[in-house]
Amino acid sequence: MNKNSLAFALLALILTSPILSLPAYAADTQSEHSSVRQKVVIQVSDNDPKKWNLALNNAENVQEDIGKNKVDIEIVAYGPGLPILKLDSPVGSRVADAIASGIKVVACENTMRKTKLTKGDMLPNLHYVKSGVPEIMY
């Protein structure tokens, strides 16, 4: 083997060795964090039943894939997305099912105040926060 071939082989080995160890690293990292409770926040700011159904589907899928006991899921509604949480909501039964399965559904009180909605206008068992966007941030 000449010097160029040897240098090339050595360089290839150096460059690929970190890549070859990635699957082992990923497995170690995954097993390390498997006992850590995950947190997911889904924001909905559209008054569109299709988008709400998508958000609810995503939340349910996360619960199924990760496990209800391993993840905290919160759906935060504000702005135009808030009225879908009213008592006459076309997705009210799905929201109720999500809440019953442990998904926290949160309504923005700023939006409620600006749209003159009260807690009496809203679906039961919702959580409330002063402002929706900061809730997503934390």
Question: What annotation goes with each model-predicted range?
Answer:
Residues 1, 22-25:
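Intrinsic disorder/low-complexity signature
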Residues 9-21:
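Bacterial N-terminal signal peptides
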Residues 24-138:
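Secreted/extracellular ectodomain signature
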